[in-house]
A protein has these predicted regions:
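Sec/Tat signal peptide C-region and signal peptidase I cleavage site
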Residues: 24-28
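N-terminal secretory signal peptides that target proteins for export/translocation
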Residues: 1-10
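Bacterial N-terminal signal peptides
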Residues: 11-23
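Conserved beta-alpha junction segments in alpha/beta enzyme cores
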Residues: 29-160, 167-338, 351-551
Length: 551
């Protein structure tokens, strides 16, 4: 069905829902074509130096000091405003939402990438792009789609790996909460090179076959994913898809896993994609060992997609071991390497002996929806101009005055001869693992208990089991609605609206006398995720919309 457009009853859903059932091939004999490409998006100039405007380092601290509206005497250091936008533009590092001094990059540990895969079958041509950035807003994705409109693509999925070692692409990590941290030159570089990566992947299409796999990284080397927020639900399954040419050579390998790419922590000032760098390199080139077995690379372009990173799944605060069984230092490059290589080994093993599966049809389903923007902290930053996007009221553009944000979700079905073989869903932010796997907080009377799983993760064993709002029902579990043997969850897909916090546990931040996490009825004041979430009703809207698409 082509070009179907429906409009929901506003009285029933209280927001406009646009449904696009995008073209899909019904011809079982249509050949599958695949092409891939990778281009660097590291913010450096032609000489390989970090891109930044010249400034006078008067206090010799090695970084630019900006004016602070809360400290009138801090006027800021002189700089050359090359683009005339009234602020210093440089490589502000993004990801760690701290309240201390901002920090800028001082060098590059490994390059950042735009990695694209284009799949075509019959009337459907799909582009999937992964960017080594903390996130990309929906209006930026729209610009990229416009630039490649002439290719006639059915859909373009642009997802962020969510690395915490890249530069600010949202505007939230500038020198203070009044100055946008994005560099216009870097943003244009990301747009243009993402466009070029898609074009190169499209031009490289050739007959291909798909194979699939899944696995869990070997636990004998330590727990690789920690869960810092109750309930403890860890999505540790690694999903992988390989596109190979008819001669058996790899075109691309797509990997989907869930820990935050933040292994080296906030102490590093070097640009990095974190463990995905080692994961991708390991799949492409091999040359590492896990369990004293040597890995052989399979070539092609490795593409990493973050999954259910919210809630909060991280490689921090947990020990892992090397080949000798020795602990690896926390927040280190060696830990990032080890995690990436174990994940690469898992992906390679998952693909071993997996024959290509015939794919008779690719179907793409997309819906736009409106998410209430009711986080008072982010709303205040938005009104200051730290990030730019339209708001909406009753489905119509409303400048900065509307209560809603426009975003999008997608479902991609890969049909085999016996039905759906693999399925992808995209979410416009950081989904909690319980949204995918179940295990929401539901206890109405008790708040706390003691569990072995919290002790395993290095805690005291005390675990909260009561939600902040016990009278609010949890959202449906998306994993139970999905189909196929291989179920890919793409977080930060086409947008970054922050953490998609289950509505029954959303506690807004406190703004006075200073910014603090909210506290719930159980006395738990570790509600960090709500500070960087669009709002309290995002999870129900996103989940309900995806459930409709999955029917």
């Amino acid at each position: 069905m082509i070009g179907v457009r429906l409009k929901s009853d506003l009285g029933l859903l209280s927001f406009v829902l646009l449904i696009f059932l995008l073209p899909s091939s019904a011809m079982a004999d249509a050949p599958l074509l695949a092409g891939a490409a990778a281009l660097e998006i590291t913010p450096v100039d032609d000489q390989g130096r970090l891109r930044q405007e010249p400034y006078e380092d008067r206090n010799k601290n090695g970084r630019y000091d900006a004016p602070d509206p809360d400290r009138p005497r801090q006027r800021g250091e002189p700089f050359t405003d090359l683009n005339g936008n009234g602020k210093w533009d440089g490589p502000f590092l993004a990801g760690f939402f701290h309240h201390g001094p901002y920090y800028t990059a001082t060098g590059v540990h490994d390059p950042l990438w735009a990695r694209a895969l284009v799949l075509e079958q019959g009337e459907t041509t799909l582009a999937i792009v992964a960017l080594d950035v903390v996130g990309l807003l929906y209006p930026e994705v729209a610009q990229i789609r416009e630039r490649v409109a002439d290719l006639g693509l059915t859909q373009v999925i642009v997802a962020a790996t969510h690395t915490h070692g890249g530069v600010d692409t949202l505007g939230l990590w500038g020198p203070n909460f009044s100055i946008d941290g994005k560099d216009p030159r870097t943003m244009e570089q990301i747009r243009s090179r993402t466009e070029e990566a898609i074009r190169r992947a499209w031009a490289a299409r050739r007959p291909a076959r798909l194979s699939w796999g899944k696995g869990r990284p070997l636990s004998r080397f330590g727990i690789l994913i920690n869960d810092l927020r109750n309930p403890v639900v860890i999505d540790d399954e690694l999903r992988v898809m390989r596109a190979e040419a008819l001669d058996g050579k790899t075109i691309a390998t797509l990997i989907n896993w869930s820990p935050h790419p933040e292994t080296v922590g906030a102490g590093s000032s070097l640009i990095t994609s974190d463990f995905p760098h080692y994961l991708r390199k390991g799949i492409e080139e091999g040359g590492f060992s896990v369990g004293w077995r040597r890995a052989e690379g399979i070539g092609g372009v490795a593409i990493y997609l973050s999954g259910s990173v919210g809630g909060l799944l991280t490689p921090l605060r947990i020990p892992i071991r090397d080949e000798e069984g020795e602990p690896i230092p926390e927040r280190s490059w060696s830990k990032a390497r080890r995690i990436g290589e174990i994940a690469a080994w898992t992906a390679l093993e998952a693909l071993r002996d997996q024959p290509p599966r015939p794919i008779v049809r690719i179907e793409v389903r997309s819906k736009t929806l409106f998410v209430p923007f009711d986080n008072p902290f982010l709303r205040g930053l938005y009104e200051k101009g730290l990030f730019q996007r339209e708001t909406y009221r009753d489905g119509k553009p409303a400048g900065k005055e509307g209560p809603d944000l426009l975003t999008e979700v997608n479902v991609i079905n890969f049909y085999g001869e016996e039905g759906i073989a693999a399925q992808f869903i995209t979410l416009p932010g950081e989904p909690f693992p319980e949204t995918i796997l179940g295990g929401h907080l539901t206890e109405k009377k008790r708040c706390w208990t003691y569990t072995g799983r919290k002790r395993e993760l290095g805690g005291s064993g005390r675990e909260r089991i009561g939600p902040a709002h016990p009278d609010i029902a949890p959202e449906p579990v998306l994993g139970e609605k999905m189909a196929g043997d291989y179920r890919f969850v793409v977080g930060l897909g086409n947008d970054e609206l922050g953490y998609i916090v289950p509505a029954n546990d959303f506690v807004p931040p406190r703004l006075k006398p200073k910014l603090r996490y909210g506290a719930d009825r159980c006395g738990d004041d570790d509600h960090y995720e709500e500070i960087v979430s669009a709002g309290s009703r995002m999870a129900p809207r996103v989940v309900e919309t995806l459930v409709e698409l999955l029917k």
